[in-house]
Amino acid sequence: MIQEESRVKVADNSGAKEVGIIRNLGGSVKKTSNIGDIVVCSIKKALPTGLVKEGQVVRAVVVRTKYGIKRKDGTHIKFDDNAVVILKEDGTPRATRVFGPVARELRDKGYLKIVSLAPEVL
């Protein structure tokens, strides 16, 4: 679970390395975001030649959390870090590659392009 003011890694090649969470979308009193949720972020660290620049405000989808999730079959899945993938205005990923594993729940939430770009789906 990721809350506001958290700093998380970026798991794509958009040029951003770290973002700060500004707002969790999906409700007026929503405190935390889990895998597959949309967040509003500010770019905190970025490469100078990347698609995004430091200080830019973007939307992103959460692809990994340390907190983990419980599946209906009773299994738990946790990752080593918190990570997001930056999105365009139409909801597709801005980058052309996704680094690291992503959760299978992204497929259920309609992020098929991110799942197809990822090297591993858990």
Curated annotation (Swiss-Prot):
One of its GO terms (biological process) is translation. InterPro entries: Ribosomal_uL14, Ribosomal_uL14_bac-type, Ribosomal_uL14_CS, Ribosomal_uL14_sf. NCBIfam families: rplN_bact (TIGR01067). Binds to 23S rRNA. Forms part of two intersubunit bridges in the 70S ribosome. One of its GO terms (cellular component) is cytosolic large ribosomal subunit. SMART domains: Ribosomal_L14 (SM01374). One of its GO terms (molecular function) is structural constituent of ribosome. The keyword RNA-binding applies. The gene is rplN. Belongs to the universal ribosomal protein uL14 family. This is Large ribosomal subunit protein uL14. HAMAP family: Ribosomal_uL14. Signal peptide: none annotated.
